[in-house]
């Protein structure tokens, strides 16, 4: 009996339990409805906290590499524990068109600490990228240095878990603008050195090491940062 080839397509969710467990599902759906070509090509890791620490024992991580037309890769990670729900993705476009990445950090650390960040992250150092018609940041979030791989349009909001979808329409607008960049330029280059400075900077900036070490141990934490999150440095 011939199998239906449609059944062999990679899922657009991380695993069978993912859809019912994340508060970020509407954002994830919007992302892959905008870029349906980004299919899972590698399941990089599926971890649980095991016995690393008492605090980390209930933590679970899934990390995927996605590939698709006009993109070198999109790498996504989803981390959950009884309090946290964190979804992180960066889309790396193919090179030759001087385009930014698109990055999103959707972070629920507790019911009192939820942070939404998405932005056009340009690989060029000391270059202030901006898009007309989108909100502009006022610079109050000093952690994100506009003009150094973060754009003038970086979107940062703190909210409560039941408020996250209030910013979904803005997120979709950013996605629409980014899709226009990709569709208009259709990048095809594969020079990963273009992203060397970007990944080096993000490695130094990213605060995930301490969190990951606590949840999954030092070895896994270092591998996650260096071999998965920022592998082009």
UniProtKB/Swiss-Prot annotation:
Classification via Pfam families: Fe_bilin_red (PF05996)
Q: Kindly list the cysteine pairs connected by disulfide bridges.
A: none
Give the enzyme's EC designation: 1.3.7.6
Report keywords, A-Z.
Answer: Oxidoreductase
Task: Please list the reactions this protein catalyses.
Answer: (3Z)-phycoerythrobilin + 2 oxidized 2[4Fe-4S]-[ferredoxin] = biliverdin IXalpha + 2 reduced 2[4Fe-4S]-[ferredoxin] + 4 H(+)
Q: Name one GO molecular function term.
A: oxidoreductase activity, acting on the CH-CH group of donors, iron-sulfur protein as acceptor
Among InterPro entries, the record links this protein to: Ferredoxin-dep_bilin_Rdtase
GO biological process annotations for this chain's record? Answer: phytochromobilin biosynthetic process
| Function of the protein | Plays a role in phycoerythrobilin biosynthesis, the red pigment chromophore photosynthetically active biliproteins of the host cyanobacteria. Uses a four-electron reduction to carry out the reactions catalyzed by two enzymes (EC 1.3.7.2 and EC 1.3.7.3) in host.
Record-stated family: Belongs to the HY2 family.
Q: In its UniProt entry, what is this protein called?
A: Phycoerythrobilin synthase
Q: Which organism is it from?
A: Prochlorococcus phage P-SSM2
Q: What is the lineage of its organism?
A: Viruses, Duplodnaviria, Heunggongvirae, Uroviricota, Caudoviricetes
């Amino acid at each position: 009996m011939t199998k239906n080839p449609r059944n062999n397509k990679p899922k657009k969710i991380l695993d069978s339990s993912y859809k019912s467990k994340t508060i970020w599902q509407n954002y994830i759906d919007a992302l892959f409805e905008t870029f349906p070509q980004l299919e899972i090509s590698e399941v990089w890791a599926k971890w649980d906290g095991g016995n690393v620490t008492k605090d980390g024992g209930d933590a679970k991580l899934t990390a995927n590499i996605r590939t698709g037309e006009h993109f070198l890769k999109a790498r996504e990670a989803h981390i959950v524990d009884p309090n946290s729900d964190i979804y992180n993705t960066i889309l790396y476009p193919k090179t030759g068109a001087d385009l930014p990445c698109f990055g999103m950090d959707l972070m629920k650390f507790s019911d009192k600490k939820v942070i939404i960040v998405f932005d056009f992250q340009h690989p060029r150092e000391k270059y202030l990228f901006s898009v007309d018609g989108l909100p502009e940041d006022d610079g109050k979030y000093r952690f994100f240095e506009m003009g150094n791989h973060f754009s003038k349009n970086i979107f940062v909001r703190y909210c409560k878990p039941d408020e996250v979808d209030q910013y979904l329409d803005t997120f979709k607008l950013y996605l629409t603008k980014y899709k226009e960049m990709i569709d208009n330029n259709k990048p095809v280059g594969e020079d990963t050195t273009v992203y060397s400075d970007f990944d080096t900077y993000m490695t130094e900036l990213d605060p995930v090491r301490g969190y990951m070490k606590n949840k999954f141990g030092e070895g896994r934490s270092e591998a996650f940062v260096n071999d998965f999150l920022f592998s082009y440095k």
